[in-house]
């Protein structure tokens, strides 16, 4: 939980929020194709003891991944992966881009074209610098004709000044 005790802290927090928004916008991955319909990339943004873990995914035209699937449906929803080294602690839940209702299956939510996911992390007092954050996604990509086998893609991101 983030506690803002003064206007200065609130200003610093909103400045970090703006940096996160810019980082989400600027993060790119390779162009998806029909042969490789989903591409993703990840990075971290570091400001003092606050860290934002950012994952962005792109889908080729006509392809989608699932955000929410009712238990009666056979599709596999996306799972965000976050493994933290000692001294780092996750704060809250994943912030996610807005999914869309899937016209073919009521109750199913999907991502088309792109999606992003952000998780906040804090460094514990006295924690040493460095370490590696593992993050990524487990997902199933589908188009209107087929669903590919699920894929897990993980990135190892070094926690160091300048991220």
Placement of each model-derived feature along the sequence:
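Extracellular/lumen-exposed scaffold segments
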Residues: 13-163
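Sec/Tat signal peptide C-region and signal peptidase I cleavage site
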Residues: 8-12
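Bacterial N-terminal signal peptides
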Residues: 1-7
């Amino acid at each position: 939980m983030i506690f803002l005790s003064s206007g200065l802290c609130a200003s610093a927090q909103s400045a970090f929020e703006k940096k996160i928004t810019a980082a989400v916008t600027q993060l790119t991955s390779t162009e998806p194709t029909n042969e490789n319909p989903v591409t993703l990339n990840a990075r971290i943004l570091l400001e003092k003891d606050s860290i934002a873990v950012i994952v962005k995914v792109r889908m080729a035209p006509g392809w989608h991944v699932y955000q929410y699937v009712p238990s009666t449906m056979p599709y596999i929803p996306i799972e965000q992966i976050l493994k933290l080294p000692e001294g780092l602690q996750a704060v809250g839940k994943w912030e996610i881009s807005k999914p869309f209702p899937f016209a073919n299956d009521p109750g199913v939510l999907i991502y088309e074209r792109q999606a992003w996911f952000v998780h906040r992390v804090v460094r514990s007092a006295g924690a040493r610098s460095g370490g590696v954050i593992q993050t990524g996604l487990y997902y199933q990509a589908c188009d209107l004709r087929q669903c590919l086998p699920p894929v897990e893609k993980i990135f190892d991101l070094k926690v160091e000044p300048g991220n």
